[in-house]
Amino acid sequence: MYSGAGPVLASPAPTTSPIPGYAFKPPPRPDFGTTGRTIKLQANFFEMDIPKIDIYHYELDIKPEKCPRRVNREIVEHMVQHFKTQIFGDRKPVFDGRKNLYTAMPLPIGRDKVELEVTLPGEGKDRIFKVSIKWVSCVSLQALHDALSGRLPSVPFETIQALDVVMRHLPSMRYTPVGRSFFTASEGCSNPLGGGREVWFGFHQSVRPSLWKMMLNIDVSATAFYKAQPVIEFVCEVLDFKSIEEQQKPLTDSQRVKFTKEIKGLKVEITHCGQMKRKYRVCNVTRRPASHQTFPLQQESGQTVECTVAQYFKDRHKLVLRYPHLPCLQVGQEQKHTYLPLEVCNIVAGQRCIKKLTDNQTSTMIRATARSAPDRQEEISKLMRSASFNTDPYVREFGIMVKDEMTDVTGRVLQPPSILYGGRNKAIATPVQGVWDMRNKQFHTGIEIKVWAIACFAPQRQCTEVHLKSFTEQLRKISRDAGMPIQGQPCFCKYAQGADSVEPMFRHLKNTYAGLQLVVVILPGKTPVYAEVKRVGDTVLGMATQCVQMKNVQRTTPQTLSNLCLKINVKLGGVNNILLPQGRPPVFQQPVIFLGADVTHPPAGDGKKPSIAAVVGSMDAHPNRYCATVRVQQHRQEIIQDLAAMVRELLIQFYKSTRFKPTRIIFYRDGVSEGQFQQVLHHELLAIREACIKLEKEYQPGITFIVVQKRHHTRLFCTDKNERVGKSGNIPAGTTVDTKITHPTEFDFYLCSHAGIQGTSRPSHYHVLWDDNRFSSDELQILTYQLCHTYVRCTRSVSIPAPAYYAHLVAFRARYHLVDKEHDSAEGSHTSGQSNGRDHQALAKAVQVHQDTLRTMYFA
């Protein structure tokens, strides 16, 4: 089962568990990869020339605290001007907007703390701030040079931070900073997304250490902002009114709830006090309209009377409200009862939208932002020219120069693996540009389907019996060709309505039809029925379900039916195809388990829902079949809390499936940012070791821990136009880079394993944080690329290895399992899985998959 020719890997060198507090060190790069044909590329990295000087780091303390960064920057700007003669002279300090200030020459304050008073001219009255400055340290750029050339073991974090602040100082004052990007409203043309939101374009910028050089990573970026507009217009967009005139009555409860959800937390400015445009943050929307909403008003006599908002505006501001039937915004602190009519408020410009975009907004966003690779390359070059870092006075102050041209990189295009099918002819497919097809091929192991049912939740007048009959015939034909014969008609084919009928119907099916293998469920577009089908099928009754959209039943195509068969065969225990055993890397010579792990977090702006951790493990030698484990954990917790128990479950399952104990564990971990590497590695590597030792004291398989990152801004472009692939002109599938733009000393590489269809391909970044198995670069890169070809849902290579992708699917499916029928409205909750006050135990039970589903790939 685990045989195969090829060189034997260095046997794993398990290290004993370190003492707590010991920091694991990622392994050094073993070598550089050599396999594959070379390809000339350009990367959106720009070489920086850094002098070997010291930078002086000071800590600022601004009182009163909690000012936005923008205000802090203004304070520092005023401070530098005001105290030019006494302290700053001709120096141009740079500031991160919080506490850190850097200068190229020391300030004449020695090591003492200096207290200064700074006045900011404000609207109405000036504001006075107290600022203290204290020396922190000397940041040596010489040390950075030593680290980049490998003379120092690790890159000093404080130098990267200092350089980043230098490079960001001017853009932060010119544009709206968001994370590591800068945005600005599009001049003259807006890009509306609907619902009061619009697209802003900008650029991402970060300083990155690489082999021998510091690099500046520059990319185009886009995000959603709220449109600066009157709140009256915002209401119309959110509630789909053509104009406010068509709303002559007060808002209904559901309209008010929807509006509140959108406007809560946003800043508005008032328009009824002339030049005094005070800004407030919205904390709520009143239930009552302005004509009825009262508040306690203190009169001159000292008496307090209840007064309506409409009356107050008429008496105090001589303003008769045009829309007294609309509610008010409650602003500031909830207990203070400050109410503003909608019509005197505007949405403040430059507020980023952190709430989840709707499906329509997301697709509009993608259409607005997708750029072919050559277009993106040109846009980045344009950005570099307009940023002109070499004339930026702050960058020059520190003696930094940035090259204008993108960095030339030599990449390699890896050979795709051969894919083996089954049936009589055991056909072999060879992917071309990451794609192959199943025509004239049969599944490696096809499942025979004897007892199956259809439940149609689409209305009968739209999805008729004729449609169902034709769909059934076509599906049976395609499935027979694919080697997954569906014998006979469905044992049950009925129409149903609404999520409430799912469980009774499924119970009836399970009790009535012995040996029922599959329920095909037809859905009318987006509906809460989907979540309920998966909850009941996966967690309550343990039944295999396959949902199909009504439009794909009304009009069948061989492609959609074939895709359905890929999913059905796997859910029922079949194997679609395998990697050709002779072509697999040597790691397969001994029993090996591939684990994929991911944590998904609830959408921003949602403080209650739990995060969901999922870990999947391979269950055969191909590797094709996987088993899943899933847990709910603390909101926004990135480390997988219960990893030891999850890995233990998967190792037991692997042993039951194969009768082998894996001698190696290859762990692909998705969703970790660089800042969390150390923390995640420390906790999770120990957890995997603990899982092994709990099974057997002496059991110490070699562990390789690889972080997979998709959310980065590295983009690669073909230097030679003839190498470009497809309409979007992307790099070919299999393109790998492990030199020049990668880490100076650690083991990392970029691999673009998929064929880009829309926009510019994003290569995945792999960073090896631990490696007992002593992989060479070639071995790990080939293995990773091959695993990207084992994803069962399609006949193409995907952008990350199948185990990491499956972990993502499992966590995403668990969100549906958490949808609480009793409390969740279908609107907006379809994947949000609200936890509505359910305790941890109830949530944990909700994601627990049924015993019969546990060993299947229900998530496929």
Swiss-Prot record:
The keyword Hydrolase applies. The modification Phosphoserine is found at residues 388, 825, 829, 832, 835. Keywords: Cytoplasm, Endonuclease, Hydrolase, Hydroxylation, Magnesium, Manganese, Metal-binding, Nitration, Nuclease, Nucleus, Phosphoprotein, Repressor, Ribonucleoprotein, RNA-binding, RNA-mediated gene silencing, Transcription, Transcription regulation, Translation regulation, Ubl conjugation. The modification 3'-nitrotyrosine is found at residue 2. Belongs to the argonaute family. Ago subfamily. Interacts with DICER1 through its Piwi domain and with TARBP2 during assembly of the RNA-induced silencing complex (RISC). Together, DICER1, AGO2 and TARBP2 constitute the trimeric RISC loading complex (RLC), or micro-RNA (miRNA) loading complex (miRLC). Within the RLC/miRLC, DICER1 and TARBP2 are required to process precursor miRNAs (pre-miRNAs) to mature miRNAs and then load them onto AGO2. AGO2 bound to the mature miRNA constitutes the minimal RISC and may subsequently dissociate from DICER1 and TARBP2. Note however that the term RISC has also been used to describe the trimeric RLC/miRLC. This is Protein argonaute-2. It comes from Rattus norvegicus (Rat).
